Structures are given as structure tokens and as C-alpha cells.
UniProtKB/Swiss-Prot annotation:
Organism encoding this protein: Caenorhabditis briggsae
Keyword set, alphabetical order: Cytoplasm, RNA-binding
Region (Disordered) residue spans: 427-460, 518-539, 551-602
Protein name as annotated: Protein PAT1 homolog 1
Subcellular location: Cytoplasm, P-body
Key word Nucleotide-binding present: no
Origin superkingdom: Eukaryota
GO molecular function: RNA binding
GO CC terms in record: P-body
Length: 864
């Protein structure tokens, strides 16, 4: 501890060394810029390079400084020095004077005020009825208390004292006093005051700037120099711009020119002389010690409430660098009541935007910006302060939008940028209506009085529906309630690791359930994903349409059945109304008696000898039923007669096909060509007669199937293909109960005739198939169509055709049916084919690559 005290320094020594080092470096920097002896360590290492040797796209003397010598080298030197000073500034700006040798936190005995007692800068015009203030400042946690802060006020900290995050300074600490930065015409440099040397450091006035603000102001003025300023200073065309800029900084009674002159003499000290032997520069009269600064802060915090109630004087012009188009008449266009916000010196927020009445004339000449989300408007001052101070954003603040950098780079005025954003983002409905007031209004009918009178005795506040709409809790929760709710949510999310603490009631309930015999159900096994279907979208749409068609047919059948029941009930009702009540003896009118046991409740009936006469309705019903039966019988007889006629024609055609006709034949004198013409005439008549709507009926009749098979044997290959195609189309209208008989009667002849076709004729037959109709009938489990297609596959194998290529050419997908009906009838119908050929056919199907080939091959093997 003694060693620490030995090398320790007092607060006054450290503050003096820090101030002397920064000011000396600035004076040395200015001396090096305007003198010829530039330090070689800071010079550019590339001495041979000259920027005038580079090629430019334009030859603009005004832009590139034509006619000047060594301007490029001076610019490079300035940039190098600016970067060096910029790095030094930010390295020393955050120095904390909390050396462990100090045993007292401050040099004053008075207790510093609490963080919550320090006033926060006000927004708007300072009026309680201001629209901007009531809409945004009252509801934004960034303009009032914040749950993210670490202050020691009445509100608690949700993060706790042991969270491990360093304390974050409030948002007001990231802001700068822009009124003190901007050069003002009203600010005058005080003349030099000759004072006697004193051993004590004089106190600084309350209007003096701190060391950090002073250095930052000097840095801003340094980097704001342009190339033309250096030109004037080199050539001597105008007054010293640097001296004028330093005079605008209000450095007390110290003259900037005298500092520049004293800089070389001050820096010329012996190399071996220690730093403490150097004489410290005299502080100006306006300097302020740390004790006086703390007392000033305490006084301002105690009198802030009184100062807010008083009318503030008219502030100076807030636009230090107005954009083009501003006139001098606009300088005093602000509201008289608007003044600089009360707060800590050096930590002020950007000045509040002007009211809508005073801002209209100025904003008419500024470009209209895109509107900003109203929830982000309270963050604009924080963003601007972070950009100007080059500081990090507080915790929980969103990142800075890029357009703020562009606006500040263009206008060079944070207050103007803030006013433009507010003017562009406030909705028109939130702006005050009615006449515009140019000055303060006093009286019961003034806008302020109306805002105060708007609150009724029973209403909680003066906020409007627009204010509640911007509130995330719709105005139903206070700040304390929100803070408490968020804290509970954070605690719940964090968890303690103990189930009894995190979810006590559920743990107790689960224990009671287990005690009662409850056991956890095993998790259901995950269903295996279904294999990807090879069905195309066209097939899928066709299947859906077919399903819808079947549902429509079923619906029609249900409607038809309901209609029959309704008609039947109507006939029964009509008959019951006219028919008298009869006894059981009516049923046995022609019998000798009723065969029933006699009892007291049912004595033996006497025979009723009256003639039984049917009613007119019953007679009509009987007649209608008989007529229906007669009509059906008549149609059946007509069909049989037509079949008999077709059989006669087929017998004649078969007789004409014979090579040797008998002597009794009526066609014995005809030539072969004439016989062929007669055969074609008769077969065409049969095909035109039966290959229409009556074909499904013909397929369900044994005589009809006989006519079809005999016709296939007589006609030529072209007509055979027509008949086969017609049979496959009409099979969808045949009852499924008849599929077995149809396959056994027709399929053998179909196989025989298809096998005898020429490969070109077979190709024509396959190309003429209606694949959509075939797929639809296969989905309906039409066994006849399935067996016919399987027969075509068998014939194609016999013709040495590749099934896969043949399936691709015909665009046919699969022979698998949903019902997977066996191939027993197909094997019986093809009894002429041996089992060896069927087995070979099954192997060809299995390794053909056709869709569902393995399932079809398995069915073929099962048919053996």
C-alpha cells in the first residue's frame, strides 16, 4: 500500500497532465501543418509517388485544384495527422480517474444526486398538450424510464445485480450539446485579461466547456477544413481561418493565436527533463473544478422543477449549417416558448423539433422523406447522438438505419434532420386542426386550456385513441405493471432447474396420477412413409373424375329409389283412403273357412258369400304391372328375333366362305369376288345392327355372345379389330357378375383371331385402343378388360416384341387392379395355351420393367 501511495498522483495533477498533453498535441499538430519542418515519422513513406501523375477521367481545375503546387502532399499530411489525432482522442476520451490510491470517490463532501433525480431532456415544445409529446414521449420507454437501465431509482432491475453485464450509461450520455458545437454569431470571444500569476488554479465559470467537449470541438473544426482554406492560408489571400475557427469555440480569455505562438516554445524542452518539471499552462478564468461541477449539477437537479414551470427565453438559431434555400428571415421563426432543454451540461439530447405551426414554412423548402414507423421516432435522438459521439448504442436499441448517415452527411445538422424525420412521419390525422396560432395563447379558449379541460373528472388521462393505438398494451397497463410482467416472463424463461419451483402444480398433479396407477402410454410407432406413386397427374385427375362419376351415379340411384318409394307410398295412401277396412276372411274368399282357433276374442267367422270386387286403383295397378311385364317380354322377344335374323345371315356368310359349295346351295353360281361382296354385305349389316347401344345387352345374353363369336370368325381383320374395340368399351356397362361367363365365351375367340393377325395389323389394333377408357375400367376392377389386355401382352410376347418398349409406345401404365382378382377364368379361357408358355410369359412380365410387373407375374403364376 505504501508503494502505491509513493507513485500515486493527486486528482489535480492527473487532470492537469491530461489537459496539457491534449492541448500541447493540438498546438504541435497545427504548428507542423503550417511549418516546413514536418516530422518524418508522420510523413508518407512513399516519397516518389505524386497524385498529379495519376490519370483522371475529367480535367476540372476547380475540382482537382489546378494551378496549385504541393496541395496533394499537404492533403496527405493533413489526412495522416487527422487519423492520428482521431485515434488519440478516442483512446483518451474514456479514461476513468478511479485509481486505487484514492480512498474517497470525490473531492466534495456533498452527496451526489440519485440517477433518477437528474432531469431528462424534454421533447416537443415543452407544453403538456403538445401532440408529439403526448403521442410518443408519454408511451415510449426510451423517453422515460427503461426496464433495461441499471439506475438506482425506485424501479427495480430485471437483470439483477449478479447478471454479469456492465452498467450501460443512459441514452442522454450519448448526446452532445449541438448549440455549443455550432458557431453562433451571438457568441463573442472575450478579450484578453491580464492577470497576475497565482499559485492556485482559478475556478471556471459555469458556462465553460469540459476538456472532452473542448477537444471534440477542436477535432470537428479541424476536419471541417476544406482544400480552399489551406490554399488561402498558404497564399495569404484571406485571414487565418484556423484562428477564426478557434475563436468561435469560446475558449475563455485565451487567444487561439497566442496558443499557436506559444506551442513551439512549450514543446522545446530538454529531452532528459521529466514531465513533471514542465510548467503547466495557465487555465482560463472560466475553468471549473470538479467540486464546483458537482455542486452545479446538484443545484440544477434541485431547481429543475421550478425552471420547467417558468417560460424559457427564446433560444438561438438551431440550424448551424442551414441547407440551400434557407433565408435569414427563418432564423427567428421558432416558438418563443421553445428553449434549450434542461439537463446535464455536455450530455444534452439533440434539440427538440419545432412545432407544426412553426415548422411548416421551413419544411416546405425541404425534400419530403419517406415516413418512418412511429414506434421508431423516439429512437431518432438516440441514433443521432450515437452517430455524432461515435458511441455504441445502449442495450435493446435497434441498429441505426443507413439513411441517417446520409442525411447527416448532407445537412450537417442533427436538429434539422430530426425535424425533417418527425415532419415526414407524423400522420396527418394527429396534427392539430383549426386555426394556426403564431404565439402563446392565454385564456380559457386557448389550445393549452382546451387540452387541460379535455380531461373529465372520471377519465384516467388525456390520451386519445391514437395514443392508445401506438401503445403495445392498448393503455391497459401502467409502466410498473409492464415492468412486473416482463420480469415474470424473463424469470419463467430462465428457469431454476427445479421442477417443483418452475411448475409446482403440474409436478404435484403428476405424482398424484402416478400414485393412482397411471402409466405413460408408449409412443406410437412412426408410420412408414408410403412409397412414391408412379401415377402421373393426368392419371390422378382421371381417377378423381371417375370417383366423382361413381359418386354421382350412386347419388342418382339413391334419388331414383327415393322417388320410387314416394310414388309407392302415394299409391298406397290413395288405395287406403278408398278401400274400406276388411277382415281376415277377405283373404280366404274362395276357401271354406278361416283356419283359426275359436276364442272369446276371436270367435269362428262365418263364410262371407259376397262377391269380391277390386277397386279401380288396384285394377289399374295390376294392369300397369302386367303391361310392364308384357313390354319387357316384348322387347326380349324382339331381341331374340333380331338374333335369329343375325344367325341366319351368319349361316349364309359361313356358306359363302366355304370353298366347295353343294349343288343345293343358292350361291353355287357366284364367283369368288361376288361371294366376298355378299359376305361383306351381311357382316356389315350385323355390325351396324348390334355394335351400338344394344351391345352390353348382347354380351349378357348367351345367344348374343354366340352371335358375337360367330361374327368374329366370319369377318376380316379390319372388322375383327372394330368388334374387339367395341367389346372393350361396352364392358364397362356390363354387370360384374357376368364377367366370368363373358370371359369364358368370348376371350378364346379373341385370342385366336388376334394371334392370327399380321404384326402391322396387330400394331394398328393396339394403336386404336382408348387408353383413358381402359385405365378407368381397370380402376373399376373390370376383369374382362384386364384379361383382354393380358391376352394382348401374351400375343406381343409371341411376336417377339419388347413389352417395355411396347408399353411406352402405347403409353400404357399397368395391368394391376385395385381388387387384385385372380386369373382363373383367364387361364380356363386360354386352355389352348400350355402351362410352359404361361410360365415363360410370367417370367417375361417379371423382368420386363413394366409398372407393377412383379404383382402381375405373381397373379399369372397363381393361375397355373
Amino acid at each position: 500500500m505504501d508503494e502505491v501511495k509513493k507513485y500515486g498522483k493527486t486528482l489535480e495533477e492527473i487532470e492537469g497532465e491530461l489537459m496539457f498533453g491534449k492541448i500541447s498535441f493540438m498546438l504541435f499538430l497545427f504548428h507542423c501543418i503550417f511549418s516546413d519542418d514536418f516530422p518524418e515519422s508522420l510523413a508518407d513513406s512513399d516519397e516518389e509517388h505524386n497524385i498529379f501523375d495519376d490519370e483522371f477521367d475529367a480535367a476540372n481545375d476547380e475540382t482537382f485544384g489546378g494551378g496549385l503546387d504541393n496541395i496533394g502532399e499537404n492533403a496527405e499530411q493533413v489526412n495522416c495527422l487527422v487519423r492520428a489525432y482521431h485515434s488519440l482522442f478516442f483512446q483518451t476520451a474514456r479514461l476513468r480517474l478511479d485509481d486505487p490510491v484514492w480512498h474517497h470517490p470525490s473531492s466534495s463532501d456533498q452527496v451526489a444526486p440519485d440517477a433518477s433525480a437528474i432531469p431528462f431532456p424534454t421533447f416537443g415544445n415543452g407544453d403538456s398538450s403538445d401532440t408529439f409529446k403526448s403521442s410518443f414521449e408519454a408511451e415510449s420507454p426510451f423517453l422515460k424510464k427503461s426496464i433495461w437501465g441499471n439506475g438506482a431509482d425506485s424501479s427495480f432491475n430485471i437483470w439483477g445485480s449478479d447478471f454479469g453485464i456492465a452498467a450501460v450509461p443512459p441514452s442522454s450520455s450519448f448526446d452532445l450539446d449541438y448549440n455549443s458545437i455550432a458557431p453562433n454569431e451571438a457568441q463573442q470571444v472575450s478579450p484578453l485579461v491580464q492577470q497576475k500569476p497565482s499559485s492556485q488554479i482559478p475556478s471556471m465559470p459555469s458556462s465553460a466547456l469540459t476538456v472532452t467537449c473542448l477537444l471534440y470541438h477542436e477535432f470537428l473544426n479541424l476536419i471541417s477544413f476544406k482544400l480552399e482554406d489551406f490554399e488561402r492560408m498558404q497564399l495569404g489571400d484571406s485571414t487565418d481561418t484556423l484562428t477564426a475557427a478557434l475563436n468561435d469555440l469560446q475558449l475563455g480569455s485565451t487567444n487561439a493565436q497566442s496558443k499557436i505562438e506559444q506551442a513551439p516554445t512549450t514543446l522545446q524542452s530538454a529531452p532528459g527533463e521529466p514531465l513533471k518539471a514542465q510548467t503547466l499552462p495557465k487555465l482560463p478564468v472560466s475553468a471549473l473544478s470538479l467540486e464546483e461541477l458537482e455542486q452545479k449539477i446538484i443545484r440544477e437537479s434541485q431547481t429543475v422543477n421550478v425552471a420547467n414551470t417558468q417560460q424559457t427565453p427564446q433560444g438561438s438559431n438551431r440550424f448551424a449549417h442551414p441547407p440551400p434555400g434557407f433565408t435569414a428571415n427563418m432564423k427567428n421563426a421558432q416558438h418563443p416558448a421553445m428553449g434549450p432543454p434542461m439537463g446535464m451540461p455536455g450530455m444534452q439530447m439533440p434539440p427538440p423539433p419545432m412545432g407544426y405551426q412553426q415548422m411548416g414554412a421551413i419544411m416546405q423548402e425541404l425534400p419530403r422523406l419517406p415516413p418512418l414507423n412511429p414506434q421508431y421516432l423516439p429512437l431518432v435522438p438516440i441514433w443521432l447522438g450515437a452517430i455524432v459521439n461515435n458511441m455504441q448504442l445502449p442495450m435493446g436499441v435497434p441498429p441505426i438505419p443507413p439513411f441517417l448517415y446520409q442525411l447527416l452527411n448532407h445537412y450537417r445538422n442533427p436538429s434539422l434532420v430530426h425535424a425533417m424525420i418527425v415532419h415526414s412521419s407524423i400522420p396527418p390525422n394527429s396534427r392539430p386542426n383549426g386555426p394556426q396560432f403564431s404565439g402563446p395563447q392565454v385564456g380559457p379558449h386557448s389550445p393549452g386550456a382546451r387540452g387541460q379541460q379535455r380531461r373529465n373528472s372520471g377519465m384516467p388521462s388525456t390520451r386519445t385513441i391514437y395514443d392508445l393505438a401506438l401503445d403495445s398494451f392498448a393503455g391497459y397497463m401502467s409502466f410498473k405493471e409492464r415492468e412486473w410482467l416482463i420480469r415474470i416472463q424473463f424469470v419463467q424463461c430462465k428457469g431454476s432447474g427445479d421442477p417443483c419451483i418452475d411448475d409446482y402444480y403440474y409436478v404435484r398433479w403428476r405424482e398424484s396420477q402416478i400414485a393412482n396407477g397411471w402409466t405413460a402410454h408408449p409412443k406410437p410407432e412412426s408410420k412408414q412413409p408410403l412409397p412414391a406413386s408412379s401415377e402421373s397427374r393426368k392419371d390422378y385427375l382421371e381417377r378423381i373424375r371417375r370417383m366423382n362419376y361413381r359418386e354421382m351415379q350412386k347419388e342418382r340411384l339413391r334419388d331414383r329409389e327415393k322417388e320410387r318409394q314416394r310414388e309407392r307410398q302415394e299409391r298406397i295412401d290413395r288405395g287406403e283412403e278408398r278401400k274400406p277396412r276388411q277382415t281376415l276372411t277377405d283373404k280366404f274368399a274362395t276357401s271354406l273357412g278361416l283356419p283359426s282357433k275359436s276364442s272369446t276374442h276371436n270367435p269362428r267367422h262365418v263364410l262371407d258369400m259376397k262377391a269380391q270386387v277390386d277397386s279401380v286403383d288396384n285394377q289399374a295397378k295390376k294392369l300397369s304391372d302386367e303391361e310392364r311385364k308384357n313390354a319387357v317380354q316384348k322387347k326380349l322377344r324382339t331381341m331374340l328375333l333380331r338374333l335369329e335374323g343375325a344367325l341366319v345371315l351368319l349361316m349364309e356368310a359361313e356358306e359363302l366362305r366355304r370353298t366347295s359349295s353343294s349343288d343345293k346351295s343358292q350361291f353355287k353360281d357366284l364367283t369368288s369376288e361376288e361371294k366376298e361382296q355378299e359376305v361383306e354385305k351381311r357382316t356389315s349389316l350385323i355390325i351396324d345392327e348390334f355394335m351400338g347401344d344394344d351391345l352390353p345387352k348382347l354380351m349378357q345374353m348367351s345367344k348374343g355372345r354366340a352371335v358375337l363369336t360367330r361374327t368374329l370368325k366370319v369377318v376380316g381383320p379390319r372388322d375383327q379389330a372394330r368388334i374387339i374395340l367395341s367389346l372393350m368399351i361396352a364392358a364397362g356397362l356390363v354387370s360384374k357378375k357376368m364377367y366370368g361367363e363373358i370371359v369364358l365365351d368370348i376371350l378364346p375367340v379373341v385370342h385366336q383371331k388376334v394371334s392370327n393377325l399380321h404384326p402391322d395389323q396387330f400394331k394398328y389394333l393396339v394403336g386404336a385402343l382408348n387408353l383413358d377408357n381402359i385405365k378407368r375400367q381397370l380402376m373399376d376392377s373390370n376383369m374382362f378388360v384386364r384379361d383382354v389386355m393380358l391376352t394382348l401382352y401374351l400375343v406381343s410376347v409371341k411376336n417377339n416384341q419388347n413389352l417395355l418398349e411396347w408399353s411406352k409406345q402405347t403409353k400404357f401404365s399397368s395391368l394391376k387392379m385395385p381388387s387384385s382378382a385372380p386369373l382363373g377364368f383367364w387361364r380356363k379361357a386360354l386352355s389352348a395355351v400350355t402351362d410352359a408358355e404361361i410360365t415363360e410369359f410370367a417370367e417375361d412380365i417379371k423382368y420386363s420393367g413394366v409398372v407393377d410387373c412383379h404383382e402381375v407375374a405373381k397373379l399369372i403364376e397363381q393361375s397355373l
